């Protein structure tokens, strides 16, 4: 049986889903809504109790540093702010597990640092699953990394240990047909 925060995904799928917050690489945002309208809409979908909604929305906007943007239409936000709105919707309802898919792709260096800091902070109170193909990005925010290739787990360790493993020497055996002079010439061009 699979459980999420003690909720059985087979017996109680709705409760299990509420225990997960998800930020896809390209968050599906309603660009004709203001930030606050969108977050209120998401809070309603997530069944955040009405009496807690305003406070939760205020808290997640503060956490993601979008409070000043709450009355702006999402269409008028930069990619960085749209990503923050996506992150805010993922943490609404305070789920136990937060899944982030490539949360810093396309952001400028300052935004990357800010989002990394926020992910670290979220990791203090939530289980954060970060999906990325950039090892340095994962190493910057995670204390444990699992590498999955073709649906199979191929490595699971701390960033430091994986870095050591991946920076080890590698040997490559080549069989080359041609003259030594031609091979040397081709290798020098690399």
What are the residue ranges of the model-derived segments?
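Conserved ABC ATPase signature
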Residues: 73-77
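Conserved catalytic motifs of ABC-family nucleotide-binding domains
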Residues: 94
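Hydrophobic anchor residue at the start of the ABC signature
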Residues: 87
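Conserved ABC ATPase "signature" region
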Residues: 40, 44, 51-69
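Conserved ABC transporter NBD signature motif
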Residues: 1-8, 15-16, 20
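ABC transporter nucleotide-binding domain
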Residues: 116-190
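Catalytic Walker B motif of ABC-type/P-loop ATPase nucleotide-binding domains
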Residues: 98-102
